[in-house]
């Protein structure tokens, strides 16, 4: 599956959330990650995030795509190269 993760997190938890997302996805903007992820890793990442997020103050939005067949991405401005990510 392909996912996009965006977040609005309190300062104290921001670094921890970013480190978790970086383990599984490509960092494309300050609070945005995207990439291909297995179901197993998706559930692991979600569990790690749920343990950190303050449900009253923070928000993590995860957009899940089963296929990229009918999708496209347009970037206006500088482009971050994600092709070299393992």
What is the role of each PLM region?
Residues 51-86:
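C-terminal structural segments of small proteins and small subunits
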Residues 10, 27, 36, 45, ...:
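Generic signature of intrinsically disordered, low-complexity segments enriched in small/polar residues
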Residues 1-41:
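Extended, hydrophobic alpha-helical segments
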Residues 1, 13, 19-20, 46, ...:
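Short leucine-rich amphipathic alpha-helices used at interfaces
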Residues 30, 35-59, 64:
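Short, intrinsically disordered low-complexity segments
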């Amino acid at each position: 599956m392909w996912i996009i993760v965006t977040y609005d997190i309190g300062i104290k938890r921001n670094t921890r959330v970013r480190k978790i997302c970086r383990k599984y996805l490509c960092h494309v903007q300050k609070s945005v990650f995207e990439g291909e992820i297995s179901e197993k890793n998706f559930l692991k990442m979600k569990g790690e995030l749920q343990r950190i997020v303050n449900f009253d103050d923070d928000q993590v939005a995860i957009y899940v795509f089963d296929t990229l067949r009918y999708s496209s991405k347009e970037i206006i401005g500088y482009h971050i190269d994600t092709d070299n990510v393992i």
